[in-house]
């Protein structure tokens, strides 16, 4: 596998949950809802709202405050640490993806994680040791900006030192893809392994 001669691609940004790994947050909060005998659809909706509105995903509040808000808003119950473990257990790295990352880096590309996450990402790395696969880890908990903020994409391009058109952004959420596209990034809306690998072929000669 080699980059096509006229290809300008310099870097690839991968989302974590929903791309590099299974979407553990959504799956986890739905399991928590079932355990608490609460409607999973309601808990999922509220969880995604609160992880942003409390500021937890931007590092502006701690985990205890997030779970307090969740329990008050939805009626879920349980020890905070056990609730967190339910979610973390649902983040499962797709077994084929590390090899793809390695092959892309062998072509001289910068491969980065760009994730709306909390310090849970660090805990997942302690378990699965995946940070070493990437050139950079951009986690909203530390950057203070989420992918809902279009300015984040300017920051990333500046940090990497590449023009937006030299960066491929891969995410499973259409809204994030559209924001990146408007900033000039190349994009791929992740649906499954087959369509992702097929889309990569336009950048490479096999």
Give, region by region, the residue ranges found by the protein language model.
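Acidic, divalent-metal-coordinating active-site segment for phosphoryl/phosphodiester hydrolysis
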Residues: 152, 172-185
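Conserved acidic E/D residue at the C-terminus of a beta-strand in Rossmann-like folds
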Residues: 171, 191
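Glycine-centered short loops/turns at secondary-structure junctions
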Residues: 106-108, 184
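Generic structural signal for small/hydrophobic residues in well-ordered secondary structure
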Residues: 15-18, 59, 104, 113, ...
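C-terminal cap/substrate-recognition subdomain and adjoining C-terminal extension
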Residues: 162, 183-187, 193-206
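Substrate-recognition "cap/lid" segment bordering the active-site pocket of phosphatases
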Residues: 119-168
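N-terminal helical cap/lid subdomain that shapes the substrate entry/recognition surface
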Residues: 3-98, 106
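Short, solvent-exposed loop/turn segments at secondary-structure junctions
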Residues: 19-20, 25-26, 117-120, 143-144, ...
């Amino acid at each position: 596998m080699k980059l096509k001669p006229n290809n300008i691609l310099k870097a690839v940004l991968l989302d974590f949950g929903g791309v590099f790994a299974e979407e553990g947050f959504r799956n986890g909060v739905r399991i928590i809802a079932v355990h608490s005998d609460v409607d999973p659809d309601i808990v999922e909706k509220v969880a995604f709202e609160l992880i942003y509105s409390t500021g937890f995903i931007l590092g502006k509040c701690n985990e205890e405050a997030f779970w307090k808000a969740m329990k008050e808003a939805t009626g879920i119950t349980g020890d905070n640490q056990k609730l967190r473990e339910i979610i973390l257990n649902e983040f499962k790295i797709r077994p084929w993806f590390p090899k793809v990352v390695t092959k892309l880096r062998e072509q001289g590309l910068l491969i980065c994680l760009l994730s709306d996450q909390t310090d849970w990402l660090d805990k997942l790395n302690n378990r699965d040791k995946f940070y070493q696969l990437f050139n950079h880890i951009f986690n909203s908990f530390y950057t203070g900006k989420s992918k809902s903020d279009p300015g984040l994409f300017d920051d990333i391009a500046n940090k990497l030192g590449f023009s937006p058109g030299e960066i491929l952004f891969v995410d499973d959420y259409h809204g994030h893809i559209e924001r990146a596209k408007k900033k000039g990034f190349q994009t791929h809306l992740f649906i499954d392994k087959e369509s992702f690998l097929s889309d990569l072929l336009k950048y490479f000669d096999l």
